[in-house]
């Protein structure tokens, strides 16, 4: 596929290779560790920002999922009062709560969207360089198509996030804060009520506020979760322990693979999100690692979920 200089602006070439995908030491859905091969591709240096998304909306008039009323057919048991445009917003609690119930810190806020990240009355002023949030999978895919790009597969994303450090726990090595230096925007303290802000941020941070990985990519860890195009499976599908048979450019394109979970909208397929966010903490969500993965319903928009794009084609000087 041929590419243009404008299309590749602020993108980094990720050389292809084979790596060990997954992890055996953390959550069950990350297993098994297995070899995967990916071809080289271009990836956005940072998550799509509010400013970049604003230019897309200005050019197309696009309206995000969070800006549209919910379809009652998708939520047959939902309160009709909640079928209005809006999105999920995180609220820090006043003290310790039951971590088994996410409703203690998440609330569906009518009027919350990418322009109004905390709901009506918030305008996101001064956040042009922050990752855009409150974008559902459909919104991310629409932006990618407009930009002449695509969303990454889960394998591409994890390979890129590792930055050439195959097998390391984090994108920068095996120590979370080497020499006491914070390497990503995550939660420090007791979630969801005590945020010590050792990293300097309570919410999202401007892209590039923390060091890049070995491929020159920033914010592959923390800040915001990122959509990938793969449907979620409870464990790695098509995995093999044989290096001779490493899947080549694998992708999960079947919605049937994504599983069904209880709750409103549970019949909707789920896509893999990667990277963790500023809300991930050792006491609750130890998912600020390349191998970590989670399934998210395709209509979900939240205050900690964004995306970045890829281009599959020729590398620098035809590499």
Region annotations inferred by a language model:
Residues 41, 56-65, 147, 315:
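Short capping motifs at secondary-structure boundaries
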Residues 35-41:
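A short N-terminal beta-strand-loop micro-motif at the entrance of redox/enzyme domains
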Residues 13-14, 20, 25, 69-290, ...:
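Functional-site microenvironments in short loops/helix caps that host divalent-cation chemistry
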Residues 303-317:
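Short, structured beta-strand segments at or near domain termini in extracellular proteins/domains
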Residues 44:
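An anion-binding catalytic pocket shared by soluble metabolic enzymes
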Residues 28-31:
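C-terminal, low-complexity/hydrophilic appendages and adjacent surface loops
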Residues 5-13:
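GGW-centered surface loops in extracellular recognition modules
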Residues 49:
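Acidic-aromatic/histidine active-site loop/patch
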